[in-house]
């Protein structure tokens, strides 16, 4: 079966991107090399096509229903704020980690690409109405310390983890790299204009290879590795997301884990080596003590990082 491509695929081809299969998608892995793109984001500004991720529009009237399904408090956060949270199942395990953009009259929910259908089904099961905007829009993440200065003549920049909008764009000051920046949602017909603006500002395209090294360097989780349907937010060291004080799906088990140390937990380590640790068990004296969930080389530290 042919892989899906985003609205920006023609641009990636024109830039001679190297592609990688990412679930059902064919996505750019790199353009000029992962190391160079990593350093671009750490020192100036780069942009990522993340349109493989979902964009679900939900009316404000549905907010209470959603709040019963996630581990964070969504109702009480101010309008024009962004929220990172986790959908949990009946056992308290993670169905997906997501971003919410809260506007005056609606919410934009951004699930991971591999979990979009699962989250849509989950919302339908719990009578949450939504409009899937994923095929009608693009999502571009512009990241790096120079980003705000470069784009502020077109975008009125909100505070960190806040949202804003123009006539053509919805956006939030969020990201997945550990750097400052914005993530921009645009209708398909506005894609070329946005690309032209970014490239004329000298902002370079970056692929998923550097996005992974950047997120690992920033100790950010990746669904399917640090989070799965067998791992709770507590076990993934994401207890800081547990701001929902109500009874939400799986909250009973999660609350028990909060008052106990008898559960697995995610830890982050630096290896004094350039060797990249792959997914494998970690043992002491022949006894398995853990599992490497992610491992990669840190270009900034010149060492390898792992999550166990």
Task: State the predicted function of each range.
Residues 41-48, 95-103, 127-133, 167-177, ...:
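Short, flexible, solvent-exposed loop/turn segments with mixed acidic/basic and small polar residues
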Residues 231-237, 241-306:
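Glycine-rich, small/acidic residue-mixed loop/short-helix segments
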Residues 50-54, 96-97, 105-107, 137-138, ...:
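Short, surface-exposed beta-edge/turn micro-motifs
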Residues 72, 78-83, 116, 155-164, ...:
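Glycine-centered loop/turn motifs
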Residues 1-88, 93, 209, 301:
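Acidic, proline/glycine-enriched N-terminal capping motif
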Residues 172, 179-181, 208-213, 217-254:
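Active-site-adjacent "lid" and substrate-binding segments of diverse enzymatic cores
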